[in-house]
Amino acid sequence: MQTNITSTKMSILVTGGTGVVGRQVVKSLELREKNINIRVGGRDQDKCNQLGFGKNSTFTRFDFMDPTTWDKSLEGVDRVFLIALPMDPTPEKSLGPFIEKCKERKLKKIVVLSVIDAERVPLVKIEQMVQGSGLTFVILRPPFFSENFSEGFMKHDIDQGTIRVPVGEHSVNWISTHDIGECASIVLMDSKFDGRTIEITGPKPINFKELSEVVSKNVGKQIRFEDIKPQEYKKCLMDRGISEPSANYLNELFTSAREDKLSKCTKGVNEITGHDPRSFEQFAKETFSNTSGSCTSKPVI
């Protein structure tokens, strides 16, 4: 695949660098380019050490809620991968001032991880801030991550044996964080995608009845799907300790799913990487153990 990658040594800050997406961005950057410095932004250095990043990757303490960590994290950095805190109902309060800090430092590029149908959730405000910043940007819009079932908000349902969500017979085109990480690493370094908002999806949508059958096969126990009402789903989330604003955020995403906004199939991953994305079936086969009869997920690397 033809790329337009500069030979100048880059320094990239990956926010959320030890998270489910950020770690994939770091690992993909390490694989693609040796002549870069990678700052792994996070709050837990021990977790960073356990992930086994390469010698070009260095942990830096970074917290959107602690502006005193920003200057040191951005020192010498010319590009940033920007990801909001999970299910943050007001990302503009923390990311907005950070984007202003990036403007002050005249960064060369910001790559933002958003979501398909971002207009329904607060992430659209972050898109607008970056688009109006005057900085070079790329916005990536995925649907739900497949890894939500192994270490995200859907893992609870798998552990309990029943996927209970307000989605009916509608489908979602799940995407693996491996593909997101690879896409992000490329657009961070390659100028030909600059200024674009790109929707990236898996290869095909799958409804939740089909999905539960795929997971059952690979987990080694029966996983049921139960369609529930949005208000019941909100209560279930809050009973698990998820805040009401975050529960509302997730409900909005499932509204997008019921309107078939998350079932679209785009060529975004192929356009950026030159290969097709992983399917949900491939994710399930690679991720879940089927030897114990329980939902045990392998580490996502």
Curated annotation (Swiss-Prot):
Function: Involved in development and cell differentiation.
Domain of life: Eukaryota
Family according to the record: Belongs to the NmrA-type oxidoreductase family.
Lineage: Eukaryota, Amoebozoa, Evosea, Eumycetozoa, Dictyostelia
Protein species of origin: Dictyostelium discoideum
MF terms (GO), sorted A to Z: NAD binding; NADPH binding
Gene3D superfamilies documented for this protein: NAD(P)-binding Rossmann-like Domain, UDP-galactose 4-epimerase, domain 1
GO biological process, one term: sorocarp stalk cell differentiation
Entry-linked Pfam families: NAD_binding_10 (PF13460)
Protein name: Prestalk A differentiation protein A
